[in-house]
Amino acid sequence: MLYLKQLNRICELNLRHSRRLSHAHQLKADVKHRQIDKVLIANRGEIACRVMRTAKKLGIRTVAVYSDADKNAVHVEMADEAFNIGPAPATQSYLNKSKILDVAKKSNSQAIHPGYGFLSENVEFCEQCTSEDIIFIGPPTSAIRDMGIKSTSKAIMSSAGVPIVKGYHGEEQSIEKLQAEAQRIGFPIMIKAVRGGGGKGMRIAMTQSEFLQQLESAKRESLKSFGDDNMLLEQYITDPRHVEVQPGLSEETRQALGEAAVRAARAVGYVGAGTVEFILHRVTHDFHFMEMNTRLQVEHPITEMITGTDLVEWQLRVAAGEPLPLSQEQIVRRGHAVECRVYAEEPGAGFLPRAGTLHRLVQPQPEEHVRVETGVRESQEVSVHYDPMIAKLVVWGRDRNEALAKTRAKLSEYQVAGLETNVNFLLRLSGNPAFVAGDVHTAFIPQHEEALFQRPSAARQSARALSAAIGHLLMTQKNNTANKSSKGIDVGPSAWRPNYQLKKTISLKLDDKEMKVTVEYIKLNEYRVQVDGGAWQQVEASLSGDARGVRLTTTVDGERRTVGLLAHQNQIHVYDEDGQTVAELPQADFRGGGAEVASTNSASSPTPGVLERILVSQGDKVVKGQPLFVVIAMKMEYVVRSTRDGVVASLAAVKPGDAVGKGAEVVLLEPEN
């Protein structure tokens, strides 16, 4: 797995050529055989659906739990039985251990599969399952405890001869002690929650001056996510690779990583699926233990695709006391696999998560070498309370180039409306020459920022504007014909009348650029088109479509091109091989009103979420860059800072704990007299 990180987990496109399975050896534990006829999945979304699919294949009945926000979720419909466990906030539902155990007993479930996240690495929950004689599908409590507390795991790994990074892993947690240890280690410093994971409770302090602020932010986020704000400090290795066992490594390094992973597992008496992660120096290939995820890994489909295994089936069999189906020596690696996490997020705004309704969701069709792991469908909500993942696209190829080429082809099949996604970013990333060559590290995104976030060329922008304009007119005409009330351009030869417009100019906004497209009717399916005052072009155009959506085919100067189209509110969505573009039409064309423009004097929430803290009061003087308030969204903390010097004129009528929408004004500033 290659993590491409910018600060926290922002966007991950994960690849693995091979990975030593976490049960690389069979522990000689005296495990009694137990029948599992029914399993409760203590999770939601795509991982709950993934576990259910294998359980059903094995003839095991499945039980879902769900919050109020998930009552119509896919995993609820997929399960044989489903039980509500509380309100939307995870602390009152998916993290409520007693409610989940009550459901397990009520449903007569012999086992609980925790998935990943939530309670998957919770020691107390594992202990409670054991005390209730319910099988926890995961490692022993002792292994979760030892590996879950990062300071403890570092000490154990050091004793086991597994290399670790220079740092502080002690119990004393006073601010003064942590500041002193940071100075001893030297900057830049990585600040990490001892119970953390997934980038939560993790910050980088590049200098001593920003250490305290980053420490406090990491502690708050850790307390919210894991109920523990203890921290460890590590030397920050610049531009490392974050590795398990994967592509771009020599066989010697791969073997050394595998042996270190086995030593790590043996040191804590590990049983079950897990993943040992390392930090690797790009030049020397020296590596250091980072952490062990004591659960099924998010990227486990990569391992399954290149080994032909079903790791969830293995988990269920091992939990029932059966031996592993294969030994390490029997596992054969073949080919290369790529996993893309498709997220509702805005890459151009620091990968801020987005929440709302998926008005349109078309995904690639699963096939032999293509998997789409998802837990949402069209018309459903992506909630502010949970991770904004829409799907995991997993593609296999004979080698890296083939796998990436197939990945780009499948990514281009996505059609999403209602929420911004990272699909366009993933397309650019997976086609980036340095990425294709395997020159990947944790600073890859900022290093290649210009290429990864570049605007489309003028020619591509013009082609998309043309498609949006003609598509808008043809779809409008088609709908009007169906409604027997034709308006505007009419493409039907028998319906065309002299009093109808032969020419129409449409105003569009693409990527914040205002454009005008003039379309002149010639005859059926033929037009003359001018984009932004440029040369007139002869265009042949026609619509087609099926259950997967409307398609527009145009021919310009002998070049034939087909794109997907969707009309949603005042937007025309254009889907092509480079991703998705949204063309906005004037609001007056649809609702008779214009969009409001937010005041530049206000500080607004960058994302839907919950207001965590307001850091200023009315009348306070503030300087540019000063933190004003904190929003929690999708389990991550976002600090909103002032963009100017000024004075706090007023605060919105919201308080910590209140929900806020994207763009909601929280602090109003005015110039200092």
What are these regions, as identified by a protein language model?
Residues 40-41, 84, 113, 190, ...:
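Structured core elements
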Residues 593-673:
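Structured functional modules or segments
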